[in-house]
Design a protein with these regions (language model features):
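Active-site HxH/HxHxD metal-binding segment of metal-dependent hydrolases
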Residues: 46-129
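Conserved beta-strand hairpin/beta-sheet module of binuclear metal-dependent hydrolase folds
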Residues: 1-50
Length: 129
């Protein structure tokens, strides 16, 4: 993972799934996506090194390679994660992602490949904006 500045207040942690970091004018830091399982700890190392504390996580969608680090970072920093109402269903029922990718209810092995932490505190982007 490598941190790169891509704008005056915007950074990217380059990885298999890029992680966005954006600072608001009032100094809040938004973390955009958190990679796969185990990436939360790696992201935290970068944040700690820079002295940054996230205000929240915004997930572009709830595929496992975008929310895998959520649980660790949410617990460590006591922050919420936001997603769209549409993706809230996928967050509630992780087998939906496997069914969506498979074109029907998936076999057992596919259900476990796409398994993720489920509802670990997602909030609706639509309802809070």
């Amino acid at each position: 993972m490598e941190l790169k500045q891509i704008g005056p207040k915007t950074f990217c942690i380059e990885h298999d799934t890029n992680i966005g970091i954006h600072f608001t004018d009032d100094g809040r830091m938004y973390l955009i996506d958190t990679g796969s399982k185990g990436d939360g700890e790696k992201i935290d190392e970068i944040l700690s090194r820079e002295g940054w504390v996230p205000s929240c996580i915004i997930n572009t969608h709830t595929h496992i390679d975008h929310i895998g680090g959520n649980e660790f970072l949410m617990r460590k920093y006591g922050i919420p994660a936001y997603c769209t109402d549409y993706d809230m269903a996928f967050a509630h029922y992780s087998e939906l992602e496997a069914a969506y990718m498979n074109g029907g209810y998936p076999a057992e092995k596919l259900r476990t490949i796409f398994a993720h932490p489920g509802m670990i505190g997602f909030r609706s982007l639509e309802k809070e904006t």
